[in-house]
Amino acid sequence: MKLFVGLGNPGARYAGNRHNIGYMAVEAIAADHGFGPWRARFQGLTSEGRLGSEQVLLLKPETFMNLSGQSVGEAMRFYKLTPADVIVFHDELDLAPGKLRLKQGGGHAGHNGLRSIHAHVGEAYGRVRLGIGHPGHKDAVAPYVLSDFAKADQDWLADLLRGIADGAEALARGDGAKFQNAVALRMQPPKPEKPKPAAKAPEAQAPEAAPDERSALQKLADRFR
């Protein structure tokens, strides 16, 4: 079994926040792949289904972001999972909006949700880093991540979530390259068609000469006129 964790904060107040893009990612997977209904478990909401041959549990911790590790740890203990079975979807300030990167293990880079997971299960789990951009100053980070995506962000956000759902099966079986390719196909605008070369106008042909119907005697006489 694989455990896909989407980080965010519970409640309608936070639903459209940049900080909740992890929630949005696992919700897109559940909707696109016919997962079961969300139900309360492990201090969060879970939905079960299959991605290819892999049984997958989707988890949205409802502990609020800073205590996400409590929920993740509880689910892992119940199913006897290791960090290698876990992939966490989270917002990433250090990536431009719409960019996506995979990471296995390593530090939490100051992300409070990851910090909590580190404290409960260690750092060896996988992450899908979802770029939301940086507001430019550290004092602006909290209000920025706790604000809704702007209207101008909606198109790339929808494409990103569709790409994540498209590639989820590849991610579950460990094919990170194919997962990223699925996302890239959604994010890249279609290339404009090359204009077809204009058809060449047919060359004008000289009019055919009228056939000479003179008799041999007339032709001879005309030569001496």
Curated annotation (Swiss-Prot):
Q: Does the keyword tRNA-binding apply?
A: yes
Region forming the signal peptide: none
Q: What is its EC number?
A: 3.1.1.29
Enzyme class, top EC level, equals: hydrolase
Record's catalysed reaction(s):
an N-acyl-L-alpha-aminoacyl-tRNA + H2O = an N-acyl-L-amino acid + a tRNA + H(+)
Residue numbers binding tRNA: 14, 64, 66, 112
Give the annotated active site.
19 (proton acceptor)
BP term (GO), one = protein quality control for misfolded or incompletely synthesized proteins
Q: Which Pfam families match?
A: Pept_tRNA_hydro
Q: Where is this site: Stabilizes the basic form of H active site to accept a proton?
A: 91
Region described as Disordered: 182-225
User: InterPro entries given for it?
Assistant: Pept_tRNA_hydro, Pept_tRNA_hydro_CS, Pept_tRNA_hydro_sf
> What residues does the record give for site: Discriminates between blocked and unblocked aminoacyl-tRNA?
9
Cite the SUPFAM superfamilies for this sequence: Peptidyl-tRNA hydrolase-like
Q: Where is the composition biased (Low complexity)?
A: 198-209
Q: In which residue ranges is the amino acid composition biased (Basic and acidic residues)?
A: 211-225
Q: Where in the cell is it found?
A: Cytoplasm
Q: Name one GO cellular component term.
A: cytoplasm
Q: What is its main location?
A: cytoplasm
- GO MF, any single term: tRNA binding
Subunit organization:
Monomer.
What family does the entry list?
Answer: Belongs to the PTH family.
Kindly give the NCBIfam families that the UniProt entry links to this protein. pth (TIGR00447)
Its function? Hydrolyzes ribosome-free peptidyl-tRNAs (with 1 or more amino acids incorporated), which drop off the ribosome during protein synthesis, or as a result of ribosome stalling.
Task: Identify this protein by name.
Answer: Peptidyl-tRNA hydrolase
